[in-house]
């Protein structure tokens, strides 16, 4: 049973192989015929490129042919001297045409109109006007608009940091500071109160009264009396006794 199946399988394989071998129009060598085609194209381009360099020599040949054409005017000059026609033209000019030509010569008035046309063409004056329209005066104004004066003002305004030159007030008292109590006369060198004011360097600081500081005269200073000191000592002793 298995042997018969194997034989049928082998027969089927050989039939398929035979069918593919004898199929009309089926060849496996098609790809080998396509490969050698692109080779001869390189030789064609080199031959056509070398022949183009010979075109420059053909131009010089045509230029020599043009110079050789110059002699024909000599033959045409001979053809213009037709000796026979002038005799017939002499007869025709002695009849009517000269009178008409005299009339035409008297009508030479048109050149006057030609003179008028040349005078009307004069407007080069408008050309002079266009040159003056250039106004260079506005160009001068633009250069003066640069104003360097403002630049000078900014540079002179820079050195305002001169607070260190403000003089302190010595031996004085503020009125609003000490309202009651005893003044200490040993106070010297009171600091300036309005330190926010800034002076330029060009202005010397001379007026010291602008700092809102008034000096109290010596007669207004209240000195400590002996009775006041005794009262102070009694108050201190009573305070310590109370605390003890």
UniProtKB/Swiss-Prot annotation:
The chain crosses the membrane at residues 224-244. GO terms for cellular component: endoplasmic reticulum membrane; external side of plasma membrane. Its main location: endoplasmic reticulum. Residues 55-128 are annotated as: Disordered. Residues 19-223 are lumenal. Residues 55-65, 75-128 have a biased composition (Low complexity). It is found in: Endoplasmic reticulum membrane. Residues 1-18 form the signal peptide. It is a single-pass type I membrane protein. It comes from the Eukaryota. Keywords: Endoplasmic reticulum, Membrane, Signal, Transmembrane, Transmembrane helix. This is Uncharacterized protein P19A11.02c. It comes from Schizosaccharomyces pombe (strain 972 / ATCC 24843).
């Amino acid at each position: 049973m298995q042997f018969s199946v194997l034989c049928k399988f082998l027969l089927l394989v050989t039939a398929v192989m035979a069918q593919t071998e004898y199929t009309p129009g089926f060849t496996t060598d098609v790809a080998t015929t396509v490969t050698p085609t692109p080779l001869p194209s390189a030789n064609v381009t080199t031959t056509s490129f070398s022949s183009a360099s010979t075109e420059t020599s053909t131009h010089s040949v045509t230029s020599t042919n043009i110079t050789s054409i110059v002699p024909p005017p000599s033959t045409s000059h001979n053809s213009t001297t037709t000796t026979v026609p002038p005799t017939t033209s002499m007869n025709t000019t002695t009849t009517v045409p000269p009178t008409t030509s005299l009339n035409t010569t008297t009508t030479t008035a048109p050149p006057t109109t030609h003179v008028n046309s040349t005078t009307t063409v004069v407007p080069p004056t408008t050309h002079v006007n266009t040159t003056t329209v250039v106004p260079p005066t506005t160009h001068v104004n633009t250069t003066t608009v640069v104003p360097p004066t403002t630049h000078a003002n900014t540079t002179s305004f820079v050195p305002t940091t001169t607070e260190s030159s403000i003089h302190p007030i010595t031996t004085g008292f503020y009125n609003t500071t000490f309202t009651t109590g005893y003044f200490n006369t040993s106070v010297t060198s009171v600091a300036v109160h309005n330190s926010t004011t800034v002076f330029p360097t060009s202005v010397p600081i001379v007026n010291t009264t602008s700092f809102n500081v008034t000096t109290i005269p010596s007669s207004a200073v209240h000195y400590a009396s002996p009775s006041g000191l005794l009262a102070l000592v009694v108050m201190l002793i009573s305070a310590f006794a109370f605390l003890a």
